[in-house]
From Swiss-Prot:
Major localisation: cytoplasm
PROSITE patterns named in the record: FUMARATE_LYASES
Entry keyword annotation includes Nucleus: no
Organism whose genome encodes this protein: Hydrogenovibrio crunogenus (strain DSM 25203 / XCL-2) (Thiomicrospira crunogena)
UniProt key word 4Fe-4S: no
PANTHER family: ARGININOSUCCINATE LYASE
Lineage, broadest ranks: Bacteria, Pseudomonadati, Pseudomonadota, Gammaproteobacteria, Thiotrichales
Catalytic activity: 2-(N(omega)-L-arginino)succinate = fumarate + L-arginine
S-S bridge residues: none
Pathway named in the protein's UniProt entry: Amino-acid biosynthesis; L-arginine biosynthesis; L-arginine from L-ornithine and carbamoyl phosphate: step 3/3
Protein name as it appears in the record: Argininosuccinate lyase
Subcellular location: Cytoplasm
GO biological process per UniProt: arginine biosynthetic process via ornithine; L-arginine biosynthetic process
Signal peptide location: none
Length: 462
């Protein structure tokens, strides 16, 4: 970054001495808010068109401003822009460069506008753009989950509670659980976008402006759905950024839980899945290692988003109306949250459909831990026992199985009948893994038929 301390500071006339060099650096935000240059220029072009519409700028002045802003953007994208800490932020840097290019007309651009409503508009435009980039990637992840779920709709695996074997489920059913969670995350983000897409421009510093602005026209140019209806609120609140970060924290929480399973399942102890080599790394000392770095990093990065959410909440919690310099601290947490979501999302969307399932291992694991015990209890209920009595009978049978090393399906009929006389040879139909999953044939159940129907509904929605 070039520090042009010889450049006149655009807001310096009121002061009797120059700003301390360290204070200039300490209070500047250009180091990070320059990423919003497109949105700042987009907002300025719309503002200039509105100023022309209401008679504040003539036709030539409007042309000069738009041409100048296009040149500024071209210079930025070509790496020719000399960013100045002396000009503090993205807004003043662009205005100073514009004035350098087109002269005094550049100084008219800020008429009827403050940096307070300008930055609030920039952030909303930036976040709207990022949301619009994130949503298709979330759909890509959903498609990837559906591909894997469809491929493994009949693959049997153990379902867990407390990370202990509970009941058999299908791998496809398990994947569809993640699909449902991410579907709600998509809905949260779409809902968040509605509130992000509100235009504060025209609020000026805090009280509005005396100029005859037409906010509706500016909003139309910038494709905002709504206009903020209170100028104090428009410039001072960052609840929309908090809401996005809350979405991100929830979404990353889901990806972190998913990651935890992928890390466990890819271990030699589980051996349920294999992650393709391109999503893993090796060890510098142990030549046999294949480390699941992608899910581990996503799991780790979740914590930083939690931190950003708390940072933004804490930033806003004690601010009186309207704008305060504290709000400069909203951008780095928001920007890093956006980057973390996009990176984690891309990694998962690439990785999930490429996961290879070890069907023999998942089936063998489902046969352990008496996973069909509940099916035996349900069988006894259908024979007339109250569920609590059936629960007790099966508990005794499981205890016997632990002592003898036999699964329920491996016990002779006579052994099972010793626990209750109503048991007949039809019991073995319900004690198979296939029988167990197929019996749960209802909306939301793990039966392959229901899993395939759920996948079809999901595809239709997407």
């Amino acid at each position: 970054m070039s520090n042009q301390h010889n450049q006149e500071k655009l807001s310096s006339a009121r002061f009797s001495e120059a700003t301390d060099a360290f204070v200039e650096e300490f209070t500047a935000s250009i180091q990070f808010d320059k990423r919003m240059y497109r949105q700042d220029i987009q907002g300025s072009v719309a503002h200039a068109k509105m100023l022309h519409k209401v008679g504040i700028l003539d036709k030539q002045e409007l042309k000069d401003i738009i041409d100048g802003l296009e040149k500024v953007q071209s210079d930025i994208e070509a790496g020719k822009m000399n960013w100045s800490i002396k000009q503090e932020d993205i807004h003043m840097n662009i205005e100073a460069k514009l004035t350098e290019l087109i002269g005094i007309t550049g100084k008219k651009l800020h008429t009827g506008r403050s940096r307070n409503d300008q930055v609030a508009t920039d952030i909303r435009l930036y976040l709207r753009d990022e949301i619009d980039a994130i949503l298709p990637e979330m759909a890509r992840l959903q498609h990837g989950i559906l591909l894997l779920a469809e491929k493994e709709a009949e693959t049997i695996m153990p379902g867990f509670t407390h990370l202990q074997t509970a009941q058999p489920v299908t791998f496809g059913h398990h994947m569809m659980a993640w699909f449902e969670m991410i579907k709600r995350d998509v809905e949260r983000l779409e809902d968040c976008r509605k509130r992000v897409n509100t235009m504060p421009l025209g609020s000026a510093a805090l009280a509005g402006t005396t100029y005859p602005i037409q906010r509706e026209y500016t909003a139309e140019l910038l494709q905002f759905d709504r206009i903020s209806e209170n100028s104090l609120d428009g410039v001072s609140d960052r609840d929309f950024a908090i809401e996005f970060t809350a979405f991100a924290a929830t979404f990353l929480m889901h990806l972190s839980r998913f990651s935890e399973e992928l890390v466990l399942w890819s271990s030699a102890q589980f051996n349920f899945i294999d992650l393709p080599d391109r999503f893993c790394t090796g060890s510098s000392i142990m030549p046999q290692k294949k480390n699941p770095d992608v899910p581990e990093l996503v799991r780790g990065k979740t914590g930083r988003v939690y931190g950003h959410l708390m940072s933004l909440l804490t930033l806003m919690k004690s601010q009186p109306l309207a704008y305060n310099k504290d709000n400069q601290e909203d951008k780095e947490p928001l920007f890093d949250t956006v980057d973390t979501v996009k990176g984690s999302l891309r990694a998962f969307a690439d990785m999930v459909p490429a996961i290879i399932v070890n069907r023999e291992a998942t089936y063998a694991a489902a046969k352990q831990g008496f996973s069909t015990a509940t099916d035996l209890a349900d069988y006894l209920v259908n024979k007339g026992l109250p569920f609590r009595d059936a629960h007790e009978v099966v508990g005794l049978a499981v205890a016997h199985g632990i002592q003898t090393g036999q699964d329920l399906s491996e016990m002779p009929l006579e052994t099972l009948q010793a626990f209750h006389s109503s048991i007949t040879d039809d019991v073995f139909e319900v004690l198979t893994l296939e029988g167990s999953v197929s019996a749960r044939d209802h909306l939301g159940g793990t039966a392959p038929k229901q899993v395939k129907a759920a996948i079809k509904r999901a595809k239709d929605r997407l």
